Regions:
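Acidic/aromatic-lined carbohydrate-recognition and catalytic surfaces
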Residues: 1-112
Length: 112
């Protein structure tokens, strides 16, 4: 439901404060919330906070330099002998890592 380029079924969130256009607008969401509260219904939303999209503002910032304040928001690792830093796998990709050309280092695949 959160704004996402939808590379991994919407878990790659681009903006945690926006609604994905396929689901409507923030005004639509506000209306939904008002209407369900009138009926004494609560809304529980799933939220993946352990990763984001490579289009998220923090990730874009983190790539700018090694000393960027957002750099530590993500896990960056050097590969080993031209390969991934470890053998972790991913649900969405064979490896949990992908190579970031700009930084010449590895970043978890869920971000890329």
């Amino acid at each position: 439901m959160y704004d996402s380029p939808n590379a991994d079924m919407g878990y790659d969130i681009r903006d945690y404060e926006k609604i994905m256009s396929e689901f409507g607008t923030m005004e639509d969401f506000d209306t939904l919330l008002r209407e369900i509260h009138k009926r004494d219904i609560k809304l529980v939303m799933d939220l993946a906070v352990n990763h984001s999209s490579d289009e998220h503002a923090w990730f874009i910032e983190s790539r700018k330099s090694l000393d960027n304040p957002c750099r530590d928001y993500y896990i960056w690792r050097d590969g080993k002998n031209g390969k991934e830093p470890n053998n972790w796998s991913s649900f969405f990709t064979p490896s949990a890592w992908s190579y970031d050309e700009k930084n010449r280092t590895m970043v978890p695949a869920s971000v890329q």
